[in-house]
Each structure stands twice: as structure tokens, then as C-alpha cells.
Amino acid sequence: MKYEAVIGLEVHAELLTESKIFCSCTTKFGGEPNTHVCPVCLGLPGTLPVLNKKVVEYAVRAGLALNCTIANFSKMDRKNYFYPDLPKAYQISQYDLPLCSNGYVEIEVDGKVKKIGIKRIHIEEDAGKLLHENTDGSLVDYNRAGVPLIEIVSEPDMSTPEEAYQYLTKLKSILEYTEVSDCKMQEGSLRVDTNVSVRPVGSTELGTKIELKNLNSFRAVQKALEYEIKRQIKVLEEGGTIVQETRRWNEAKGITEPMRTKEEAHDYRYFPEPDLVPIIVTDEWKEEIRKSLPEMPHRKRERFISEYGLPEYDAKIITSSKKIADFFEKCALEYDSPKAVSNWLMGEFSRLMNETGKEIDEVPVTPQMLVKLLKLIDNGVISGSIAKTVFEEMFGTGKEPEVIVEEKGLKQIANEDELREIIKKVIAENPKSVEDYKNGKEKAMGFLVGQVMKATKGKANPQLTNQILKEELSK
């Protein structure tokens, strides 16, 4: 019997408001433990919450960008459970009347467009953070308690780990573009829980659902789903039954492990939050927010293709991140070869960001500095290969490219007489390659060029090197 997977995702995104959802404490990441707190977010007796209007506005922005219906009337609810990181022993969330519902995003997998439904988006407060350090017990940092979140719940419309990966990538891009969240998984401002079950192909009945946690990257989501789908199919094929539970992804072992039995919604004993009035979003306010939405990724991609002549692949990669798209456009306005800019962003820039785990706004290279580097190549001051060395130094130190070139003596050798002497020496030292070239073996020319580059430590002007080599070899 063949099986298929059914996948749904719950994404928690911290909102980029300056203050918390029900008090004026800062939402800034970091800080000494328990310094961004007050009686309200600590849930002390006698305190009352006041809903931050910006939280509602940002949630509506996200909802509109994700094609949702925005409720004119919604309310907050208490979700009751006990855990040390929850100071009030309940979380203020939304239950039966979410702010946004019935949305969708379109993803592209294997050249086909698929619509993934968004069941609901609701607002809620974050909990604190447990710290398991070398002490007799665990510590709690409540700095994060009360930070505003939106929870985006998809429909179970995904059937492969790749679709889940593409959905998350698209969702992150939209949240960044709308400036609703910075989506930094390493700081916990974007968190993903995955629900997955399997069923016989063709069946409409859902299988037993497993929730996966401890997913700290989109690739981890993909790998965990790949493993979990295989595990569930194996259990069923061996005549077993799937137990509804929450499982943790173990990155080191590449497996999922049981955590606890999955709670049902009624275990939380939801009831309306008595200390907050209902949320009213008028049509006028909704329209005002809609008009303030920025250019979305798909529109920017179309514009980059038509305005800057980028190939579709380049435009898709560049516009997947708002920060990278903005960086590209600043460069393209100052430099007349947008394709060269995109090559650098997708090549060296991307490689070093991946190696260091940094985002483009966290590195010291500005658009103006990259343009200067590209102009140094165009003007023959340095070669393309030397430019990569210069760029690494720029990336690490923030120094201007011309300063690095001067300090390290990296200027190209463009003096014809000087270069001719080096080439004559290379020809004299490699008679076999010279003979091969004269016998029609073009690869020999590449070898000789490589020897010239080696002798000059990559500083020979490539065009001049080829020209002089051909002249000398024709003698």
C-alpha cells in the first residue's frame, strides 16, 4: 500500500513593536535576565493589561499580505495551563474569534504553483524562557514574557517536506517585506511547529497527527519531516498504530524522539479574557493599513526583471529577502551592470553570510563599497579573482576596497614590458605546454595563463596576459 503525507504548520512570529503587547516594557532582544519586566508582564496581583494598538495593526498588515479576511470583531481569550515560564498560569491569546482567517500563499515546487491555505492568524503574548544551566535547578528569564506574537496556522495542504520548506520561505519573505517581524530564528523571533500524519494514497480520512518541535531552521523542518514520514509509514506497514504525541527533532542523531502526549484544545480551558474589551477593526482602518503595504516580493521580482534586465532565477533569489533586494537596488542605482551585482550577491556575498551566519544588514559592507569594488575590476585596477580576496577582507574588517588594495599591494600588473618579461620566463620554463599549444591543444594556453597568474600571485591583467602570450607563442 502506498502512503502520502499530510502536513500543516504553525508559525509563531514575534512582532516588531517597540513595546510589549499589554505593557510599556521594551521588546528588545537580549539584556540581562529579568530586566525588561514590570508588574503587568510578570502577572502580579492587581495589574491590568492594556492592548497595544500597534500589535493589532501589524497583525492586520500580515493578514492582508497573506490574503486573509480581517474580522471586524474579535476578542482575546485566556489559555490556561501551568508552566514555570508562564507567570500568570495562563496565556492571553485568541480562540474562537481570530483576527484573520481564510488566507493563502502560493508556492512554486517543480515548476508548478500550489496554493497553501492559511486557516487563521491570531495574536497572543509570548511566554518567558527557561534556562537550564549548571545549577541545582532551572532558571526563568521573563524578558520575553508579554512580547507580542502572531500565530499563523496553515491548512493541512502540504504533502511533501519540500512544499513545507517553500511555504516557510515564502511566509518569511512576506513577513519581512511587510516589516511585521524580523524573522530571526536564531533569536527566537520565528518559531515553527509541524503537524504531520500519513494516510493511504487516495484516502480522504486524516491519519493520527504528530506534532514536531525543536525545529531551529527551515532545513531542520524539512529533515524532521522526511524522517517522521518514513517512521510513520514503517510503523503502519509493520501492523502498528501511530500514537498521537509531540516529538522532538534530534539534529545530532537525525531522528525524532517522543516528548509528551499531545494535548487537545479543551485541555486549555479557554474562556474570554475579562480584563480586555473586544477588538474592533473598522473597514476604514483596514483600508488605511492596506494602502500602507509595501511592494510585495512577486511584484518586486517582476520589476527587477523588466527594469534591471535580471534573469528570472536571479530576480527570484534576490527578492526572496527584502534586505538583499534593497541592497541590490541601492547598488543598481549607482552601477550600470545589475547582473554583475546579482552575481556577487548570489556568489561571494551569499557564501560568506552562510559561513558566518550573518544577515546582510549585519555585515560591514555597504552597497557603495560593493560598487567601488566592481568599478576597481572594470577599471583594470584588480582582477576578478583578486577582487574575491579583497571582498573577504572588506567583509571581515569593513575597510574600503581601495584601502585594502593599496595596503596589500594587490593592484594588477598592467605594465606591458613588466608582464612580457614574466611571460617569457613562463614560456621558457614550460616547453612541453608550448609544444602542445603549437600542436593545436587549446588547453595548454589555459595552463600557461595559470602559470603566469601563479608567478604574479593573481595580479596579472588577464586580457593583457592572453594578448602577450599569443604574441610570444606565435614567434
From Swiss-Prot:
<comment type="function">
    <text>Allows the formation of correctly charged Asn-tRNA(Asn) or Gln-tRNA(Gln) through the transamidation of misacylated Asp-tRNA(Asn) or Glu-tRNA(Gln) in organisms which lack either or both of asparaginyl-tRNA or glutaminyl-tRNA synthetases. The reaction takes place in the presence of glutamine and ATP through an activated phospho-Asp-tRNA(Asn) or phospho-Glu-tRNA(Gln).</text>
</comment>
<dbReference type="GO" id="GO:0050566">
    <property type="term" value="F:asparaginyl-tRNA synthase (glutamine-hydrolyzing) activity"/>
</dbReference>
<dbReference type="InterPro" id="IPR004413">
    <property type="entry name" value="GatB"/>
</dbReference>
<protein>
    <recommendedName>
        <fullName>Aspartyl/glutamyl-tRNA(Asn/Gln) amidotransferase subunit B</fullName>
        <ecNumber>6.3.5.-</ecNumber>
    </recommendedName>
</protein>
<keyword id="KW-0436">Ligase</keyword>
<comment type="similarity">
    <text>Belongs to the GatB/GatE family. GatB subfamily.</text>
</comment>
<keyword id="KW-0067">ATP-binding</keyword>
<comment type="subunit">
    <text>Heterotrimer of A, B and C subunits.</text>
</comment>
<dbReference type="GO" id="GO:0050567">
    <property type="term" value="F:glutaminyl-tRNA synthase (glutamine-hydrolyzing) activity"/>
</dbReference>
<keyword id="KW-0648">Protein biosynthesis</keyword>
<dbReference type="GO" id="GO:0070681">
    <property type="term" value="P:glutaminyl-tRNAGln biosynthesis via transamidation"/>
</dbReference>
<dbReference type="InterPro" id="IPR017958">
    <property type="entry name" value="Gln-tRNA_amidoTrfase_suB_CS"/>
</dbReference>
<dbReference type="InterPro" id="IPR006075">
    <property type="entry name" value="Asn/Gln-tRNA_Trfase_suB/E_cat"/>
</dbReference>
<keyword id="KW-0547">Nucleotide-binding</keyword>
<dbReference type="InterPro" id="IPR042114">
    <property type="entry name" value="GatB_C_1"/>
</dbReference>
<dbReference type="GO" id="GO:0006412">
    <property type="term" value="P:translation"/>
</dbReference>
<dbReference type="Pfam" id="PF02637">
    <property type="entry name" value="GatB_Yqey"/>
</dbReference>
<dbReference type="InterPro" id="IPR018027">
    <property type="entry name" value="Asn/Gln_amidotransferase"/>
</dbReference>
<dbReference type="InterPro" id="IPR014746">
    <property type="entry name" value="Gln_synth/guanido_kin_cat_dom"/>
</dbReference>
<dbReference type="InterPro" id="IPR003789">
    <property type="entry name" value="Asn/Gln_tRNA_amidoTrase-B-like"/>
</dbReference>
<dbReference type="InterPro" id="IPR017959">
    <property type="entry name" value="Asn/Gln-tRNA_amidoTrfase_suB/E"/>
</dbReference>
<dbReference type="InterPro" id="IPR023168">
    <property type="entry name" value="GatB_Yqey_C_2"/>
</dbReference>
<dbReference type="GO" id="GO:0005524">
    <property type="term" value="F:ATP binding"/>
</dbReference>
<dbReference type="Pfam" id="PF02934">
    <property type="entry name" value="GatB_N"/>
</dbReference>
